[in-house]
């Protein structure tokens, strides 16, 4: 992993936007010269990347919202965040 922990507070990098692609009927992250399609789970996580909430807080919110195991949600949130960070879509 690239230094991402449960205390990381990610936000979208400058030039990256979360947008609904109406032609595809799908939410995407738009970055210069690329588009990353998001599934429903990645979308609810990406919507919370505001630079103020930690990954632990995001995981707790999602666990409560979906009545799911908090530890598993946190592991999944960290994994997704690491993937998007490696693609240079997030800042920490």
Curated annotation (Swiss-Prot):
It holds the Pfam family PqqD. The keyword Transferase does not apply. It comes from the Bacteria. Gene3D superfamilies: Coenzyme PQQ synthesis protein D (PqqD). Keywords: PQQ biosynthesis. One of its GO terms (biological process) is pyrroloquinoline quinone biosynthetic process. Pathway: Cofactor biosynthesis; pyrroloquinoline quinone biosynthesis. Disulfide bonds: none annotated. GO terms for molecular function: quinone binding. HAMAP family: PQQ_syn_PqqD. Monomer. Interacts with PqqE. Belongs to the PqqD family. Functions as a PqqA binding protein and presents PqqA to PqqE, in the pyrroloquinoline quinone (PQQ) biosynthetic pathway. This is PqqA binding protein. It comes from Xanthomonas axonopodis pv. citri (strain 306).
